[in-house]
Structure formats: structure tokens, C-alpha cells
Amino acid sequence: MSAMRLFALTSAMLPLAFILSTSPFPATAAEKNVIVEQRNASSSPKQRLDQLFSQLKRERDPDKASSIANEIRLEWNDSGSATINLLMQWADKAIEEKRNPAALDFLDEAIALKPDYAESWNRRATLNFVMGNYRKSMSDIEHVLNIEPRHFGALSGMAAILSNSGNDQLTLKAWERFLDIYPADRTAQEQVNMLAEKLAGNRT
């Protein structure tokens, strides 16, 4: 699992496939072209995201919901600033080459230039987790959720950290928040059911 994949977990925790599916990856050139073509010139990024999240909340088919989630990720990956986008690309490359200190520098700069861009915080949260800096990772996640409370990728990261700490009750709450945004995700459903049963068993 590369550093860009959101929050590596042990086999007893989240399946790798789910972490990959909830991580917001950098968009390819082709994907960015699709975004541009699909965007309505009269709609703002916030309006597009609001519409996509509304669709995601209503959709019950997992495959269709996954497609909507991918559109949301693509929107998240565009900061609206060429400078920030370039810094994020440099950070991604540094992470891929395992130059984590350089990646942190790029992400720190992106955050300093545009502190309201959630994805730079989220990317740094991922890197901090991979580097074992769990408190810093959770702090970054909280910043992400302050900016974009519907960030299901950050919520899955929060659940991963809480699960690692052994706090099943708070892990369950994180997954319930996730499902309130993205109800069709099967793995999140399984996590909620598993944790609910485990906690119920502990009470008996």
C-alpha cells in the first residue's frame, strides 16, 4: 500500500480495498478533462458538490454510488489554484518516491497558501498516519472535517485511527457518520454491523 492510500490497517481492521476506494487520489489528465466537460459554467464548485452529495445520499445501488463518490473525489482534487495544484502534484511525487520530509514541506506550503483547501489537510493526514504521527494525523483530519464535514475519506481515516487505538465506540460513531453521507458503501455497512454486534456482546 503506497503512502498515498489512506491509512494502512491491520488485517483485523478495514479491508485494503475499502481504504483504496475511499481515498481521494490525484486526478489524471483525462479525468480532469471530463470534469471540465461536465461542469456547468453557471454552477460553482460548492453547488456541484452539494448536488453530488445529495445524489450520493439518495443512491442505494453500490456501483452507482461509487461512481458518484468518484466524481466527488475529482472535485476535491481541484483546488481552483494552479499553484496549489502544482504543490499537491509535487507532494504526490515525493510521497511516491518515499521522500516524506519533502512531501510534508510541499503540503505545509499548500496549507499555508490556502488553509481552506480540505484536500491538502487530508493528504497531510494520510502522510502523518503512514509516518506513525497519529495525533498529528487526527488533528489534520479534524481540520478537513471543519472545512468539509461530508469528507467521507477523512471519516474513514478517523475510523482507522480510532480502531487502532481500540476505541470501538468512537470507531462505530465515525462509521455511522460515514454512512449518513455515503449509505450505499457495503464495507462501511459491514463495519457498522460488526462493531454494533461486538459492543452489544460486550454489554451482555
Swiss-Prot record:
InterPro entries xrefs: TPR-like_helical_dom_sf, TPR_rpt
Question: Where in the sequence is the signal peptide annotated?
Answer: 1-29
In terms of SUPFAM superfamilies, this protein maps to: TPR-like
Q: Does the keyword tRNA-binding apply?
A: no
Superkingdom of the organism of origin: Bacteria
TPR repeat start and end residues: 84-117, 118-151, 153-185
Keyword Lyase set for record? no
Write the record's keywords in alphabetical order, separated by commas.
Answer: Repeat, Signal, TPR repeat
Protein name as catalogued: TPR repeat-containing protein RHE_CH03534.1
